[in-house]
Amino acid sequence: MNRPAWMTVAGCLLAWGLAAGATSAHAATGRPPNVVLILMDDMGWRDVGFMGNEFVETPHLDRLANRGLVFTQAYASAPNCAPTRACLMSGQVTPRHGIYTVVDPRQPPGSPWHKLRAADSRSELATEIVTLPEALRSKGYATAFFGMWNLGRGRTGPVTPGGQGFDTVVFPENLGFAKDAYFDDDGNQLSDRLTDEVLGFMERQKAGPFFVYLADHAIHAPYDPEPDLLAKYERKPAATGDQRNDAAQAATIEAVDRNVGRIMERLACLGIADDTLVIFTSDNGGTSRYTPPLKGGKGELSEGGIRVPLVVVGAAVAKPGTTCDVPVVSIDFYPTLLELAGAKPPAGQILDGTSLMPLLGGRANLDRRDLFWHFPCYVGRATPSSAIRAGRYKLVEFFEDGGRVELYDLSADPGERQDLAAKSPDIAKPLATRLRAWQRATAAALPDGPNPAYDAASDRPRGGGRRDAGKRR
């Protein structure tokens, strides 16, 4: 396997080290910047070093953070993978595109622990939606997709990446990997091989502009870590406090970190690091056993299920090495990248996000806005719910309990330990009213009445579906 360390070529190290002070080609020529969007699978808010994880080693991501802008209150648009990916491609909240979960949510007549019949969920992104790559192609971008799609079945056709705006498409299966496998039969690692393909594409398209969407399978369970990395973390002393100490997970994350380093090295070697905006984030939070100090995990609208790491580096970042505490959400990427590219919003298509260009440019805040999430389905232990965040307060509505709400002050209580709904009705009631008005305005699907198969004595699943044991080669 090709495993170069960060900046193995001295000239590349110098090139990226000076990038922040260089005059970019896009600024000099008017050509739009390149974009590399790296989306991880199930990576929690605190699963990387630059967010305070002291057990896993992520030197390349930490370097990215030191050279970029870290968003400390970044959110996925949904608590599980497919809807977040649909939000990224459409720029719309989940009720508009109708994708709420990656699996069939209804499971007729319903699992015995489901009190309600889950709302229906689309299995593919509607072709009428103008996707982000389609919008960028209108400005001359070469577009490429690598990894997991989850927005339509098949390898060719209108609902696949090739039919939704990507010129180049590479699935794991194209590289000889079985579904959900971390290694192929020859011992090649998936993150390495996907990155090989990304590097080749960037080399071919170095004249730009290009848009790369790398949707890695990592760090989805079951893990299958590289033996040498696994042994390293099994020998490593445990971190203290609420730090996670999962050797298999840490080894999987370090392999991802290595490949982020390879991408940044290649951008520098090609002389286009300063002409490229790199975004690194995750599709949802980790699982409830892996998200401290946050509560809950994947599938849930608690902070542990939707808060994610986010770092942006390169073109348009005015103050490298800084942090931003403004709450942002992944539907913001679509309008941000349109503005970066100088592209107009698609005619007749609602975009629910807000451009982050002012924040990237050094502004301290955005205009005040509410953030919304809607999940009328079941995944793991998660039940149908909807949420609003307005400033420091977040309110969650639980549909199983007749619309019961919980209210949290995230500034004082980011772990959501103290429910303020009963003691602060003056805050909870207006937020609930705004949330329900938003549900009506977006025609949000709701659970479809009681589940006839419900059995109060049945046991719920033990978490968000993550398994510790990996598939061994």
Regions found by a protein language model. Name each.
Residues 31, 53-57, 75-80, 103, ...:
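A short beta-strand-to-alpha-helix junction
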Residues 51-54, 70-92, 100-106, 145-159, ...:
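Short, solvent-exposed turn/loop segments enriched in Gly/Ser/Thr/Pro and often Arg
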Residues 56, 156-165, 222-225, 265-318, ...:
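Histidine-centered active-site microenvironments of extracellular/periplasmic hydrolases
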Residues 25, 29-33, 40, 45, ...:
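Long, internal low-complexity/basic segments
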Residues 30-34, 88, 140, 144, ...:
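Active-site regions of oxyanion-processing enzymes, predominantly non-cytosolic
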